[in-house]
Every structure is written in C-alpha cells, then in structure tokens.
A protein has these predicted regions:
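Short, intrinsically disordered, charge-balanced linker/junction segments flanking boundaries
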Residues: 1, 303-306
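P-loop NTPase nucleotide-binding core
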Residues: 1-141, 151, 195, 200
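Amphipathic alpha-helical scaffolding segments
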Residues: 3, 51-63, 160-168, 284-290
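Short secondary-structure boundary/capping segments
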Residues: 17-22, 158-161, 200-207, 289, ...
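Short, solvent-exposed segments of well-ordered alpha helices
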Residues: 23, 27, 114, 118, ...
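Short, solvent-exposed secondary-structure capping/transition elements
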Residues: 41-55, 153-157, 176-182, 198, ...
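Conserved AAA+ ATPase small/helical "lid" subdomain
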Residues: 49-53, 230-299
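The catalytic "switch" region of P-loop NTPases
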Residues: 121-261
C-alpha cells in the first residue's frame, strides 16, 4: 500500500501537466493516472516480495523496471519529482507509441516532462498493462489519497479540476484492475462538504457505484470518534506493555464539565470539526500540557493529573 497526503507536494509541477483542448473536468485525469501508476510501480518493484509470481509477471516487471530506472534514475523514485519540468523520460524502447502525435521538434526517443501531456494517454495505457500484469492476484494493493482539503478553495477552478480529475482517474483505474482480476484499489478520502460542491458529468455514477460514506457521531450511525480514539489509546498502551483496553474516561476526567456544561468529548469534538487528525492533535496537545503540569512542583493533586 501507499498513502499520499500532499502536505509537501509540488502542485506547481502538477499544474503544468494540465492537458489542453479537453474539458476542465478531465484535464488532470491523465496526469493523476500517471502518478498513481508510478506509485503502484514503486510497490511492485520495492515492497511486494512475492513478485514476480509467474513468467508473465517477471516479463512485465522487467519492462516496468527498465522504464522507471531509465526515466527517474532509480527503481524507487521520489514522487514529488515525478513531474519536475527539468526531467526528460525515454520513450523508446520501452513503449510502442504513435510518435506522429509528438509536437514538432520533439524526439521520438525521449520527451521532456513539459511535453508529456501530448503522449500521456498512450504512456498510461502501456504502463497500465505492465503494472496489472505484474501484480500478484492473491495480494491486495492500495493507493490512498488524504488531506486533499488542505488549502481548499471552492472558488479556485484549477483546485476543483484537480479533485475531479483524481476521482475520475481513480474510478478508471479501479475498473481496469477489476477487469484484470487483480485486487488493486485507488482510495480517495474527501470531506463530504467538498465532494458536494464538485460538479461534473459522471458524478452521479461515481456516487452510486464507487462512493462509501464514512461518518461518525450522526443519527445514522453508532460509530463515534470517541471509539476511534479509544482504539488508538489502546494501541499506544500496548506499545509500552499495558495490555488492556484504554477507555476515554481513563484519559479524560468527564466528571468535571467544561464551560457551558459541555463534556470534554463534546468540547473537543466541536473544536476539531469531527476531523480525526485534528482530534488526535488535540489529544496530543492535552498530553503535552499534562506532562508539563505533572512535572511542575505546584502540581500535587489527582485532579491535576486527569
């Protein structure tokens, strides 16, 4: 599996990969597919020790490795540099492409990343064949995208286009993987308020066939962020040889209400907007303050330690 958070991703490089002459909703679809396929190539070449699992897989992996190493100088390339405009990638002898589509002055042997959008559909098609043929059908593979809400601006057309392109790319690759009978899934974690503002032609189909709603603390579910945090507390406790389930009340003293007669859980929940990562940050901040007070000479009471 591989996870993308994009906190330090060079969006300005990706921005230059917009494919011209097609609708805005689709202009980033092919560049997302390329990034996903390169990510999956990294898993194939560096993580799954069961590969190659047969002769077809061995042949596909050999071709895939030759392209990746030739293009990026390593079988484990830095994904933040995939679209670096200073880079060139060799097309021959790795891919059989229609080189007539290259713009004037471009080489059939290699192409600059700046010119990649002119052939990216053909490159993706070849890459797709290689990665799907390489995968072990008994294993499960995941590429996940998260924190796409960082810097969200519903008035920024390119931001919206990038999100739509990612959803379309993930949908297309998931369909291809299913048809190839391999267990590979592209997963995009996106806040529902952001998803709701997206407008594109295939949205209804994606909503009906490819979307799962993950929610907590709503009338529709019994799942809560409190239970999620308790699981994390227990995992941390097991790391220090505490073999027991850790409850929320073991960490936070709920007998003492917050201002406004709120429980500590409701207080934290309201200030983290039901975002798990923000609740984790809040809990870590509370832990840091607890340690400060614990080490303070003025802290002597049990209440100070809850």
């Amino acid at each position: 599996s591989y996870g993308h958070t994009f906190s330090d991703y060079p969006w300005h490089f990706h921005q230059q990969q917009a494919k011209a002459g097609i609708p805005n909703d689709e202009k980033f679809t092919h560049s997302w597919k390329y990034l996903i396929l390169i990510s999956l190539s990294k898993i194939i070449l560096n993580q799954d020790n069961s590969l190659p699992f047969n002769d077809e897989s061995r042949e596909a992996m050999s071709k895939l490795e030759a392209f990746i190493v030739d293009a990026y100088g390593s079988r484990d390339p830095d994904l933040t540099q995939v679209f670096n405009p200073q880079r060139e990638i060799r097309l021959k002898p790795h891919f059989e492409l229609n080189f007539k589509i290259l713009k004037a002055g471009a080489s059939a042997e290699s192409i600059s990343i700046a010119d990649l959008p002119t052939v990216i559909q053909e490159v993706n098609a070849q890459l797709m064949k290689l990665v799907l043929a390489s995968l072990n059908p008994e294993h499960k593979y995941f590429i996940a995208f998260d924190q796409l809400d960082l810097g969200f601006d519903n008035k920024a057309d390119d931001y919206i286009s990038r999100l739509i392109g990612l959803l379309l790319a993930g949908r297309d690759i998931n369909i291809a993987a299913k048809n190839a009978q391999v267990k590979f899934l592209v997963t995009v974690f996106l806040r529902d308020d952001i998803y709701n503002v997206l407008r594109f032609e295939d949205k209804n189909k994606i909503t009906e066939n490819f979307m799962s709603l993950i929610e907590w603390d709503t009338p529709r579910t019994t799942k809560t962020l409190k239970s999620l945090m308790e699981k994390r507390f227990s995992i941390v406790a097991s790391d220090i040889d505490i073999e027991q389930d850790v409850k929320w009340s073991d960490i936070f003293n709920e007998t003492r209400e917050m201002p406004g007669h709120q429980s500590k859980y409701d207080h934290i929940k309201d200030r983290t907007y039901l975002r798990p990562r923000d609740m984790i940050k809040f809990a870590n901040s509370a832990l840091a303050k607890f340690k400060e007070r614990l080490n303070s000479p003025a802290s002597n009471t049990q209440d100070d330690k809850r």
